Amino acid sequence: MRPLKFFVSQSLVLRVLPLLAITCLLLMPQLARCTDDASSHDMSGMHDGMSMPMDNSADETPAKLLADKRESEFNHHLAGLLVLAAGIFMIAEGNIRARRPLVRQAWPLCFLLSGLFVLVFSDTELWPFNSQSWYFGLTHHAEVLQHKAFAVLLLALGVIELLRARGTLKAGWWGYVFPAIAMVGSVILLFHDHQGHAHGADHMEVMRRIQSEHLGFAVTGFGIALTKGLAETPSAWRAFFKRLFPTLLLVLGALLLVYVE
């Protein structure tokens, strides 16, 4: 029965992983194009009116804008808490693994929970929270598409690392899937659309701050991808990178926890 479970799990991941990689590659031009279009539309609106960064901003009440701001900050903070927890579990694993073997599965579960949360709660204008369909949101709003792409990447990381922790995926090359996915996520962050969060007279300052914060996320993400890959590679520095990898997870978690718009 166990060999059958191993075969099913491994064959499923082997089928899903290439599809995920192809999907991400196909999404990259669309993400960049949507972001560029939104930026061009925003600049054109600024030249015409110089009052609001987006045409539909005037239709949104201050209460709605404040609610959206708080929702976005909460989402980042909760994701940061889960990433922070993942780093703590990973650092503590060496000390308590002998007494609590299941702790090895704790940090992948943090990524799974984060992915599920982002998938469901990142855009509450979509069904079932509101009437807007997922198809419309994904095809008309770059930010929605990016959020769901992040969710899929987090879920993929969680599933693969959980299967590795349980001993289902034993091949050494599975250890390099995390760095590859983390690299893709970091690249997407560089194209992340922030147009919907900049409103009011100081919207340019808000935009610069949000872009700066997401650049910090991306740079830390690249560091996480690099150190995780080196931690999986046999070398004299392997032990060092195994410690540095969860440390950078703590850094990313802290950056997400202090995120403000």
Across the structure, where does each feature detected by a protein language model lie?
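Membrane-interface helix-loop-helix modules in multi-pass inner-membrane proteins
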Residues: 114-162, 190-197
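N-terminal secretory signal peptides that target proteins for export/translocation
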Residues: 1-12
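Boundary of Sec targeting at the N-terminus
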Residues: 33-36
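Hydrophobic cores of alpha-helical transmembrane segments in multi-pass inner/ER membrane proteins
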Residues: 80-90, 112, 146-162, 216-229
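Membrane-interfacial loop-to-transmembrane alpha-helix junctions, especially the N-terminal start
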Residues: 98-112, 171-180, 236-246
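Juxtamembrane boundary at the C-terminal end of a transmembrane helix
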Residues: 255-261
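Bacterial N-terminal signal peptides
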Residues: 15-28
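Membrane-interface interhelical loops and short amphipathic "cap" helices
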Residues: 38-73, 124-143, 194-210, 261
